[in-house]
Amino acid sequence: MTPDDPNNGNDTIPILIRELDDPSIDNRHHAILVLAGMGAAAVEPLIRALADASDNDRRWYRAIALAKTGVPAIDPLIAAMEKNTDHEFRRYAAAALGEMGEPAVEPLITAMASDDKELRGVLSRALCRIGKPAVDPLTRRLSDANEILRSCATLTLWQMGETGLPSMVEQIRDEKKV
């Protein structure tokens, strides 16, 4: 293994990533499970594969593998979304983050402080996908000192509809009492 080895010495990762394109759905599901089990070692190669994917099916299976990898993929995925402005890449990366649930909430909210409007939009959609676990952390940001975060929290709770609106309304009522 060399320091510049993109696969961290694991030659099976590229093979498994290619297996995500296999005509057999069983082979694709197997590849997802094995890649997810590899944890952090599979994250960067999967992110590169997601960025290089030529169609939505390929993006979908790479995103699912990243989602199943879980916590080790959160920060690298957000960092990749900040650098890669391709809409489809961001959309599928956000879907992966949204599937990770509660562990992704705080990193997603923190990343919404970005000046990049499109990035904030896809991060918001990921939080909407997470749903209820994101409501309290977003509600706490309604009075954040950062105007962008306040605005993003408000809009995200609004987009959540019945899941986010009651919490937002309660926060506004509490602020009026003070």
Give a label for each model feature.
Residues 136:
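Glycine-centered loop/turn positions within well-structured domains
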